[in-house]
Amino acid sequence: MWVNGAKVSEQPLYNTAKTVGSVFQNPRSQFFNVDTTSEITFGCENLGQPEQSIRERLEKTVRDFRLEKLMGRNIFHLSGGEKQKIACAGVSIMEPDVLVMDEPSSNLDASSILDLRATLAFWKSQGKTVIVSEHRLYYLRGLADRFIYITGGKVEKDYSAAEFESLTEQQRAKLGLRTFILEDLLPPKALPQAGQQMELRNFCFAYKNEPETLHIRESKIPANRIVGIIGNNGAGKSTFSRCFCGLEKRCGEVIWNGRTYRPKDRLNTCYMVMQEVNHQLFTETVLDEVLISMEEENQEWAEEILAELDLIGFKDRHPMSLSGGQKQRVAIASAIASKRSILFFDEPTSGLDYKHMKEVANVLKQVRDAGITLYVITHDLELLLDCCTDIVHFEDGSIIDKFQMDEAGLEKIRNYFIKGVPTK
């Protein structure tokens, strides 16, 4: 491989780093610092740039990425999307000629995706080469000049922007690709009858020495359904899920079916698939990962779950050797095997192509039909429309709206996701 006339394999890494910047699919795997400001400037410091130059670049990068509220923060207290922003800023500050991005939008909210699009457009206007490996395609419409389709490690097709846009949604789906035009994803659909509700009381939480990030004094949310939880990065969605599942002690009560569930009780009732699934993969094989979640091991059922999620061929592989999307599906399989009555999924389709997103959606619907309550934190409009019956909208640590996915709900979703996105 050659970059700017130089063979990459023959160049020392520090030389390549001056020319090529990269953002990993899991941003945490490229962090070297605990606080956000130090992380952004780390690359420039590593390249030995003058202190004043680094300060000036930092100020510009913070403005370009609108990161004022994230400066000086503990990286481990950020949401997945906020970590992604810090990773992008840490690469941009070094001003490379070539930027390689692996699923940069996978954990970003609708507003942040528009910010990402603006950043890509800015880099493009500067004459930089930007290579984006993506499953989520709609935000690249009108921006990307070429679309290269890779399968089995080989380039199968090379489309111009016009050629790719001329494909029908059916043709793209056949290739396993996500939608390119969001408006095409908004058909009306039949909804199951509204079911029970859970009552929340005193769901308030703050990290040590930081402002309160969750403040729900009293509210009700649907039960026995697939509930999509939406909101911008940092709105409190992941914190809410941790508190609900009992992972944060002393946080709130849930009243359901006439019983009050305190945090300790909820540990045995809920199961959470985390946004960063590496935190909950423990065993030597994929099959063992599913079996360990069962009260009584049932290999036949475990293999059925893996087959439903297109993982049976990986049952003897080490979970950490899989791709990000495959790890995500392994964690989902473990959640299903646990037979808990309430399941939380934090971005379950990040990094998944169309085929595997549909498989996850179908499995979630099957689990719901078995009487399980599912809460799905997601920025994935395709997943919401495929399987969610209700939406809970978070903002600034509070629930600001709740609605069914009926015609009125679809209009709200349109306003949330499609505003600012190129349309037909």
Show where each model-derived region lies.
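H-loop/switch region of ABC-family ATPase nucleotide-binding domains
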Residues: 134-135, 378-379
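Conserved ABC ATPase signature
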Residues: 74-78, 82, 318-322, 326
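ABC-family nucleotide-binding domains
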Residues: 109, 353
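Conserved ABC ATPase "signature" region
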Residues: 53-70, 299-314
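Hydrophobic anchor residue at the start of the ABC signature
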Residues: 88-89, 332
